[in-house]
């Protein structure tokens, strides 16, 4: 009897409409016509505050759900992005947004709305930029 009930319930579950189990996903396509700095997006990140970040060939784009804010390199602003070509993005456990560009690696500080480059002393011969940043369980950042 128990086997019969299991088979009956299994068969009935296959016959039930699955529309209640699935949800239609809503996608909106954004281009430079809607405010994105460039139509080619290399990386994307949703941060802990809910912002969407998009790295392009022409700067870093922060999207709040309504409009884009574009961050670009500006030689007259030392706290701007170091380069407009964004390779990858990463948010660490402290909420810092790390940005890997084609020439430097930096992090974004929400408090000052500024970018700060990652610097090394000349003695350790470290590169100025990396392609990826990750964090381990102990909070150590791994630069690759």
What are these regions (language model features)?
Residues 1-144:
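Carboxylate-rich, polar loop motifs that coordinate divalent cations or form catalytic acidic clusters
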